[in-house]
Design a protein with these regions (language model features):
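PLP-dependent aminotransferase-class I/II
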Residues: 99-144, 151-158
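Conserved C-terminal alpha-helix-loop-beta "cap" of PLP-dependent enzymes
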Residues: 74-78, 268-342
């Protein structure tokens, strides 16, 4: 059996494991105050062309989202997100557990628009009973989205502009950011994220690291005392250098971008194979996540050799499923899967 159900079925890229072993017996300061975290921070700042950014390393995505959102919002504020957004459907109420409501907006493809946000905020701030309701205080988006779709630079800029209009923060979840940045249709760069968000993070857990997410803060107000929030939310790793070593390695010789491109290229081969067979696609994704609509009988046949994720029923006889490639996916296995798709 070969697993395509997610992009974190393996451990870490061999270069990271090698560097972890090489540095294992070194003595360093803890809590992210070591030379490896310093080096990784500087590399990220250079790539973002933003020397004033603050960079912090946390362990996982949900922990990162709860820490950022709880640091950014007042007690009476909530986070605006797509109804399918990770914080709304896949984090077990973690945001709500901090006392902040998720304010969902409808979305067919995983994205939300500046127009939607503007309409929601206008309705709130012109309501005579506004102080009786949760105030929108932040917009949360992800790139790629849960559905593998991508924001354009124009869409990002428009969202940032409407956030400034209503004095809100824009937070971009980058758990799969590498796969978004390297997608053939993507026009957003790290430099754009530094300009047109208040805070974003660069995912490591799903892009070659054993664990870890790198939070990049450009908003001055959010920078203050952020390490206190990390500690309070259980995110300050005593052996913080384990995060620094990993991100320092990922951003040496463009490794992060190379392994992300590898996953996207293999995903595009799968996408073309599904289309050639005549299968529809639930979402038009150019990232490492693909969502073909298959006859249920074909799904059962493919499940004999591969593990992939059920997404939703489309008809009585068809379902959408998700296939994920990753930095570790073997090209020869993708070729074998393509042959099996053709044989269905």
């Amino acid at each position: 059996m070969y697993r395509f159900q997610c992009d974190y079925t393996e451990g870490a890229h061999p270069a990271i494991m090698q560097r972890m072993v090489e540095t294992n017996m070194e003595q360093t300061d803890g809590y992210g105050l070591d030379p490896y975290c310093d080096s990784a921070r500087q590399k990220i700042k250079d790539l973002c062309e933003c020397q004033d950014a603050d960079v912090h390393f946390l362990v996982g995505g949900t922990q990162t989202n709860t820490t950022v959102i709880s640091a950014a919002l007042r007690p009476y504020q909530g986070a605006v997100a797509a109804v399918s957004g990770h914080i709304n459907v896949h984090e077990t109420g973690a945001i709500e557990a901090t006392g902040h409501k998720v304010l969902p907006l409808p979305s067919g493809d995983g994205k939300i628009s500046a127009v939607q946000v503007d309409e929601m905020c206008h309705a709130h701030f012109t309501d005579g009973s506004q102080e009786h309701m949760v105030q929108p205080g932040m917009v949360y988006i992800s790139h790629p989205t849960e559905n593998g779709t991508l924001y354009t630079k124009k869409e990002l800029m428009d969202l940032y502009e409407v956030c400034k209009k209503y004095d809100m923060l824009l937070f971009l979840d980058g758990a799969r950011l590498g796969y978004g940045l390297m997608a053939e249709t993507n026009d957003i760069a790290l430099t754009d994220l530094a300009k047109y968000t208040d805070v974003f993070y660069i995912g490591g857990t799903k892009v070659g690291a054993l664990f870890g997410e790198a939070v990049v803060i450009t908003n001055e107000a959010l920078k203050k005392d952020f390490r206190y929030m990390i500690k309070q939310n259980g995110g300050m790793l005593a052996k913080g250098r384990l995060l620094g070593v990993q991100f320092d390695t990922l951003f040496t010789d463009d490794l992060y971008f190379k392994i992300s491109a590898h996953a996207d290229q293999l995903a595009m081969k799968l996408k073309k194979a599904f289309q050639k067979k005549g299968y529809g696609l639930r979402y038009d994704s150019y990232t490492n996540q693909q969502f073909p609509i298959l006859p249920d009988s074909h799904i059962e046949k493919l499940k004999e050799k591969y593990v992939f994720e059920f997404w939703e029923k489309v008809s009585d006889a068809e379902s959408a499923v998700r296939f994920c490639t990753s930095w570790a996916t073997k090209p020869e296995v993708v070729e074998e899967l393509i042959r099996d798709i053709e044989a269905c």
